[in-house]
Amino acid sequence: MSSAIINGKEIGQEIRNAVAERVIRLKEQGLTPGLAVVLVGDNQASATYVRNKQKSCEAIGMYSELIKLPEETKQEELLTQIQQLNQREDIHGILVQLPLPKHIDEDTVIATIAVEKDVDGFSPVSVGKMMLGQETFLPCTPFGVMKLLEYSGIEIAGKHAVIVGRSHIVGKPMGQLLLQKDATVTYTHSKTPDLPSFTKQADILIAAVGRANFITKEHVKEGAVVIDVGINRDDNNKLCGDVNFAEVDGIASHITPVPGGVGPMTITMLLFNTVQAAENKLAN
Protein backbone atom coordinates (compact mmCIF):
# COMPACT_ATOMS: atom_id res chain seq x y z
CA MET A 1 0.00 0.00 0.00
CA SER A 2 1.25 3.53 -0.82
CA SER A 3 2.10 6.05 1.88
CA ALA A 4 -0.38 8.86 2.54
CA ILE A 5 0.82 12.01 0.76
CA ILE A 6 1.15 15.17 2.84
CA ASN A 7 0.16 17.80 0.29
CA GLY A 8 1.98 21.07 0.98
CA LYS A 9 0.25 22.85 -1.90
CA GLU A 10 -3.21 22.21 -0.45
CA ILE A 11 -2.28 22.91 3.18
CA GLY A 12 -0.29 25.98 2.13
CA GLN A 13 -3.25 27.31 0.15
CA GLU A 14 -5.57 26.84 3.12
CA ILE A 15 -3.21 28.88 5.32
CA ARG A 16 -2.74 31.52 2.58
CA ASN A 17 -6.52 31.96 2.31
CA ALA A 18 -6.66 32.67 6.06
CA VAL A 19 -3.69 35.07 5.78
CA ALA A 20 -5.41 36.88 2.86
CA GLU A 21 -8.43 37.47 5.14
CA ARG A 22 -6.11 39.07 7.70
CA VAL A 23 -4.65 41.31 4.95
CA ILE A 24 -8.18 42.52 4.09
CA ARG A 25 -8.83 43.36 7.74
CA LEU A 26 -5.54 45.28 8.00
CA LYS A 27 -6.30 47.24 4.82
CA GLU A 28 -9.70 48.19 6.25
CA GLN A 29 -7.72 49.82 9.07
CA GLY A 30 -5.52 51.66 6.58
CA LEU A 31 -2.48 49.39 6.74
CA THR A 32 -1.10 47.30 3.85
CA PRO A 33 1.47 44.68 5.00
CA GLY A 34 4.78 45.31 3.23
CA LEU A 35 7.71 42.95 2.61
CA ALA A 36 11.11 44.13 1.36
CA VAL A 37 13.33 41.51 -0.26
CA VAL A 38 17.02 42.33 -0.69
CA LEU A 39 18.85 40.44 -3.44
CA VAL A 40 22.61 40.89 -3.89
CA GLY A 41 24.26 39.59 -7.07
CA ASP A 42 23.03 37.42 -9.93
CA ASN A 43 22.39 33.99 -8.41
CA GLN A 44 19.69 32.58 -10.73
CA ALA A 45 18.17 30.24 -8.13
CA SER A 46 17.89 33.16 -5.69
CA ALA A 47 16.29 35.35 -8.36
CA THR A 48 13.67 32.63 -8.99
CA TYR A 49 12.91 32.30 -5.26
CA VAL A 50 12.53 36.07 -4.97
CA ARG A 51 10.14 36.23 -7.95
CA ASN A 52 8.00 33.51 -6.34
CA LYS A 53 7.95 35.41 -3.04
CA GLN A 54 6.86 38.62 -4.76
CA LYS A 55 4.11 36.88 -6.75
CA SER A 56 2.83 35.22 -3.57
CA CYS A 57 2.71 38.59 -1.77
CA GLU A 58 0.76 40.21 -4.58
CA ALA A 59 -1.66 37.26 -4.79
CA ILE A 60 -2.89 37.93 -1.24
CA GLY A 61 -2.92 41.73 -1.52
CA MET A 62 0.36 42.50 0.25
CA TYR A 63 2.90 45.08 -0.88
CA SER A 64 6.33 43.77 -1.85
CA GLU A 65 9.46 45.61 -2.88
CA LEU A 66 12.64 44.18 -4.39
CA ILE A 67 15.93 45.88 -3.64
CA LYS A 68 18.39 44.45 -6.16
CA LEU A 69 22.05 45.23 -5.58
CA PRO A 70 25.08 44.32 -7.74
CA GLU A 71 27.44 41.47 -6.80
CA GLU A 72 30.23 43.91 -5.89
CA THR A 73 28.10 45.80 -3.31
CA LYS A 74 30.19 46.52 -0.21
CA GLN A 75 29.02 45.18 3.15
CA GLU A 76 28.66 48.74 4.54
CA GLU A 77 26.37 49.68 1.63
CA LEU A 78 24.16 46.66 2.28
CA LEU A 79 23.99 47.43 6.02
CA THR A 80 22.99 51.04 5.24
CA GLN A 81 20.24 49.76 2.94
CA ILE A 82 18.89 47.49 5.71
CA GLN A 83 19.04 50.30 8.29
CA GLN A 84 16.94 52.45 5.94
CA LEU A 85 14.39 49.63 5.61
CA ASN A 86 14.35 49.28 9.42
CA GLN A 87 13.16 52.92 9.59
CA ARG A 88 10.45 52.69 6.93
CA GLU A 89 6.85 52.71 8.15
CA ASP A 90 5.48 50.93 5.04
CA ILE A 91 7.82 47.92 5.38
CA HIS A 92 6.87 45.36 8.05
CA GLY A 93 9.12 42.48 7.01
CA ILE A 94 12.69 42.43 5.70
CA LEU A 95 14.21 39.40 4.04
CA VAL A 96 17.79 39.21 2.78
CA GLN A 97 18.02 36.43 0.21
CA LEU A 98 20.83 34.01 1.02
CA PRO A 99 23.51 33.08 0.04
CA LEU A 100 25.26 36.45 -0.09
CA PRO A 101 28.50 37.07 -2.06
CA LYS A 102 31.61 35.74 -0.30
CA HIS A 103 32.94 39.17 0.78
CA ILE A 104 29.81 39.89 2.86
CA ASP A 105 29.38 38.41 6.34
CA GLU A 106 25.88 36.90 6.52
CA ASP A 107 25.73 36.91 10.33
CA THR A 108 26.44 40.65 10.52
CA VAL A 109 23.83 41.39 7.86
CA ILE A 110 21.10 39.28 9.51
CA ALA A 111 21.84 40.79 12.94
CA THR A 112 21.26 44.27 11.45
CA ILE A 113 17.61 43.53 10.58
CA ALA A 114 15.27 45.03 13.20
CA VAL A 115 13.93 42.13 15.28
CA GLU A 116 10.31 43.26 14.77
CA LYS A 117 10.88 42.97 10.99
CA ASP A 118 12.92 39.73 11.03
CA VAL A 119 10.25 37.66 9.27
CA ASP A 120 12.79 34.96 8.35
CA GLY A 121 13.43 34.35 12.07
CA PHE A 122 17.21 34.16 11.57
CA SER A 123 18.50 36.98 13.79
CA PRO A 124 20.30 36.09 17.05
CA VAL A 125 17.44 37.63 19.08
CA SER A 126 14.76 35.67 17.19
CA VAL A 127 16.75 32.44 17.54
CA GLY A 128 17.30 33.06 21.26
CA LYS A 129 13.59 33.70 21.83
CA MET A 130 12.69 30.55 19.88
CA MET A 131 15.09 28.51 22.05
CA LEU A 132 13.40 29.89 25.18
CA GLY A 133 9.93 29.19 23.80
CA GLN A 134 9.09 32.90 23.76
CA GLU A 135 6.89 34.50 21.12
CA THR A 136 8.93 35.42 18.05
CA PHE A 137 9.04 34.91 14.29
CA LEU A 138 9.88 31.27 13.59
CA PRO A 139 12.15 30.28 10.66
CA CYS A 140 9.80 29.70 7.73
CA THR A 141 10.78 26.16 6.68
CA PRO A 142 10.68 24.51 10.15
CA PHE A 143 7.50 26.51 10.92
CA GLY A 144 6.01 25.18 7.68
CA VAL A 145 6.92 21.60 8.61
CA MET A 146 5.18 22.01 11.99
CA LYS A 147 2.05 23.22 10.18
CA LEU A 148 2.18 20.21 7.80
CA LEU A 149 2.26 17.86 10.80
CA GLU A 150 -0.51 19.78 12.58
CA TYR A 151 -2.85 19.94 9.56
CA SER A 152 -2.23 16.24 8.81
CA GLY A 153 -3.28 15.29 12.35
CA ILE A 154 0.10 13.74 13.17
CA GLU A 155 0.76 13.32 16.89
CA ILE A 156 4.11 14.79 17.99
CA ALA A 157 4.05 14.49 21.80
CA GLY A 158 5.87 11.38 22.99
CA LYS A 159 7.16 10.53 19.50
CA HIS A 160 10.81 10.09 18.57
CA ALA A 161 11.81 12.62 15.90
CA VAL A 162 15.12 12.14 14.10
CA ILE A 163 16.55 15.01 12.07
CA VAL A 164 19.13 14.41 9.36
CA GLY A 165 20.93 17.75 9.01
CA ARG A 166 22.06 20.47 11.39
CA SER A 167 21.88 23.74 9.45
CA HIS A 168 20.92 26.97 11.23
CA ILE A 169 18.08 27.41 8.72
CA VAL A 170 16.35 24.03 9.05
CA GLY A 171 17.97 21.28 11.13
CA LYS A 172 18.69 23.06 14.42
CA PRO A 173 15.45 25.07 14.69
CA MET A 174 13.43 22.05 13.54
CA GLY A 175 14.60 20.07 16.56
CA GLN A 176 13.73 22.92 18.92
CA LEU A 177 10.18 23.27 17.60
CA LEU A 178 9.58 19.51 17.86
CA LEU A 179 11.04 19.51 21.38
CA GLN A 180 8.60 22.25 22.39
CA LYS A 181 5.76 19.97 21.25
CA ASP A 182 7.12 17.19 23.54
CA ALA A 183 8.87 15.03 20.96
CA THR A 184 12.10 13.24 21.88
CA VAL A 185 14.62 14.62 19.40
CA THR A 186 17.80 13.11 17.93
CA TYR A 187 20.08 15.13 15.64
CA THR A 188 22.14 13.31 13.01
CA HIS A 189 24.42 14.69 10.30
CA SER A 190 27.19 13.90 7.80
CA LYS A 191 29.59 12.76 10.56
CA THR A 192 27.09 10.41 12.27
CA PRO A 193 28.39 6.81 12.02
CA ASP A 194 25.88 4.11 10.99
CA LEU A 195 23.13 6.60 10.18
CA PRO A 196 20.38 3.97 9.60
CA SER A 197 20.72 2.74 13.20
CA PHE A 198 19.47 6.19 14.28
CA THR A 199 16.97 6.97 11.53
CA LYS A 200 15.34 3.52 11.85
CA GLN A 201 14.21 4.56 15.36
CA ALA A 202 12.30 7.60 14.06
CA ASP A 203 8.54 7.92 14.35
CA ILE A 204 9.03 11.23 12.53
CA LEU A 205 12.01 11.47 10.18
CA ILE A 206 13.05 14.90 8.88
CA ALA A 207 15.49 14.84 5.94
CA ALA A 208 17.30 18.17 5.54
CA VAL A 209 20.72 17.17 4.30
CA GLY A 210 20.78 18.64 0.77
CA ARG A 211 21.73 15.41 -1.03
CA ALA A 212 19.59 13.95 -3.80
CA ASN A 213 17.75 10.70 -2.89
CA PHE A 214 20.04 10.22 0.13
CA ILE A 215 17.44 8.62 2.42
CA THR A 216 16.50 5.13 1.21
CA LYS A 217 14.35 2.29 2.53
CA GLU A 218 17.36 1.25 4.68
CA HIS A 219 16.85 4.41 6.75
CA VAL A 220 13.11 4.22 7.42
CA LYS A 221 11.10 2.06 9.80
CA GLU A 222 7.65 0.78 8.88
CA GLY A 223 4.95 3.36 9.59
CA ALA A 224 7.25 6.37 10.13
CA VAL A 225 6.23 9.86 9.01
CA VAL A 226 8.84 11.12 6.51
CA ILE A 227 9.26 14.84 5.86
CA ASP A 228 11.55 15.70 2.93
CA VAL A 229 12.96 19.22 3.16
CA GLY A 230 15.50 18.76 0.34
CA ILE A 231 15.29 20.39 -3.08
CA ASN A 232 17.89 18.91 -5.41
CA ARG A 233 18.43 17.83 -9.01
CA ASP A 234 19.15 14.17 -9.74
CA ASP A 235 21.55 12.84 -12.42
CA ASN A 236 18.86 13.44 -15.08
CA ASN A 237 18.39 17.04 -13.88
CA LYS A 238 14.97 16.12 -12.49
CA LEU A 239 13.77 17.87 -9.33
CA CYS A 240 13.98 15.56 -6.32
CA GLY A 241 14.26 15.64 -2.55
CA ASP A 242 16.67 14.15 -0.02
CA VAL A 243 14.43 11.07 0.18
CA ASN A 244 14.30 8.37 -2.49
CA PHE A 245 10.52 8.63 -2.81
CA ALA A 246 10.03 5.47 -4.90
CA GLU A 247 11.86 3.34 -2.31
CA VAL A 248 10.29 4.84 0.81
CA ASP A 249 6.72 5.07 -0.54
CA GLY A 250 4.76 2.24 1.08
CA ILE A 251 7.14 1.93 4.05
CA ALA A 252 6.32 5.35 5.53
CA SER A 253 2.79 5.94 6.83
CA HIS A 254 2.95 9.55 5.54
CA ILE A 255 5.42 11.27 3.23
CA THR A 256 5.91 14.72 1.68
CA PRO A 257 6.58 14.77 -2.08
CA VAL A 258 9.13 16.97 -3.88
CA PRO A 259 7.95 19.21 -5.40
CA GLY A 260 4.67 20.05 -3.65
CA GLY A 261 5.52 19.14 -0.06
CA VAL A 262 7.60 21.40 2.18
CA GLY A 263 8.47 23.93 -0.58
CA PRO A 264 5.09 25.71 -0.80
CA MET A 265 4.97 25.95 3.01
CA THR A 266 8.18 28.00 3.27
CA ILE A 267 6.76 30.94 1.31
CA THR A 268 3.36 30.52 3.00
CA MET A 269 4.92 30.97 6.45
CA LEU A 270 6.90 33.98 5.21
CA LEU A 271 3.58 35.62 4.28
CA PHE A 272 2.15 34.54 7.65
CA ASN A 273 5.08 36.12 9.54
CA THR A 274 4.93 39.37 7.52
CA VAL A 275 1.21 39.82 8.18
CA GLN A 276 1.86 39.05 11.86
CA ALA A 277 4.53 41.79 11.86
CA ALA A 278 2.02 44.26 10.40
CA GLU A 279 -0.58 43.27 13.01
CA ASN A 280 2.03 43.72 15.77
CA LYS A 281 2.78 47.22 14.43
CA LEU A 282 -0.91 48.13 14.51
CA ALA A 283 -1.32 46.75 18.05
CA ASN A 284 1.62 48.83 19.28
Swiss-Prot record:
Which positions are tagged coiled coil?
A: none
EC number(s) given by UniProt = 1.5.1.5, 3.5.4.9
Q: Which UniProt keywords apply?
A: Amino-acid biosynthesis, Histidine biosynthesis, Hydrolase, Methionine biosynthesis, Multifunctional enzyme, NADP, One-carbon metabolism, Oxidoreductase, Purine biosynthesis
GO BP, sorted A to Z = L-histidine biosynthetic process; methionine biosynthetic process; purine nucleotide biosynthetic process; tetrahydrofolate interconversion
Q: Could you tell me the superkingdom of the organism this chain comes from?
A: Bacteria
**Keyword Transcription regulation among record annotations:** no
* Record's keyword annotation contains Hydrolase: yes
GO CC terms: cytosol
Q: Which SUPFAM superfamilies match?
A: Aminoacid dehydrogenase-like, N-terminal domain, NAD(P)-binding Rossmann-fold domains
Q: Record's family?
A: Belongs to the tetrahydrofolate dehydrogenase/cyclohydrolase family.
Spell out the protein name for this chain.
Answer: Bifunctional protein FolD
Where is the organism placed in the taxonomic lineage, from the top?
Bacteria, Bacillati, Bacillota, Bacilli, Bacillales
Q: Which gene encodes it?
A: folD
